[in-house]
């Protein structure tokens, strides 16, 4: 009996969650997410929200927790891309600032370092800065209602990679040895190829 009560309670919770999601999403779709959804997306989502609401008060009044969860997941599949666009719009500037702060920090940190360290770190910083600038320009011409070409998570990954590489360079006092690039033997033979006039 307790197990049956538990199932009924879970189903009730899932139904309430689905119902709340329908109302919340309808509100956000025409307010918060307005500029982040295409007209066809808004139309499709509105239609699905209306169908779900009608189902909840007609056929879906007494279903299992799994049925309500499945309905919720179906709606989220439609809404999640829009929510990602909205959230990433706010997260990108902060992530970009963090990356630019890291670049400035490393540029300042290597000013008195040996030339090989300074040049290697400055090259990594320039590469990260150029990547950010190019991607930001691409993103700036995109409408807000399409999936971003530059995600804040990509900027964070670039900042993490920059931190790892620059720290390795500064610890080893020189450019990191990149195992995939076996050109170290080329550097030793270059001196013999020079000709005098």
Task: Cite the ranges covered by each PLM segment.
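PAZ/PAZ-like end-binding module
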Residues: 1-197
């Amino acid at each position: 009996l307790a197990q049956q009560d538990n199932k009924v309670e879970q189903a009730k919770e899932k139904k309430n969650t689905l119902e709340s999601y329908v109302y919340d999403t309808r509100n956000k779709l025409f307010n918060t997410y307005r500029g982040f959804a295409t007209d066809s997306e808004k139309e499709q989502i509105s239609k699905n929200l209306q169908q779900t609401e009608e189902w909840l008060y007609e056929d879906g009044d007494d279903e299992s927790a799994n049925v309500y969860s499945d309905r919720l997941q179906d709606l989220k599949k439609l809404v999640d891309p829009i929510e990602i666009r909205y959230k990433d719009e706010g997260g990108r500037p902060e992530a970009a600032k963090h990356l630019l702060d890291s670049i400035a920090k490393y540029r300042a940190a290597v000013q008195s370092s040996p030339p090989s360290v300074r040049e290697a770190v400055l090259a990594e910083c320039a590469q990260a800065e150029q990547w950010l600038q190019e991607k930001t320009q691409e993103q700036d011409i995109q409408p807000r209602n399409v999936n971003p070409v530059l995600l804040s998570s990509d900027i964070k990954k670039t900042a993490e990679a920059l931190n790892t590489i620059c720290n390795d360079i500064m610890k080893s006092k020189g450019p990191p040895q990149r195992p995939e690039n076996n050109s170290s033997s080329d550097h030793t033979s270059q001196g013999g190829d020079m000709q005098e006039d």
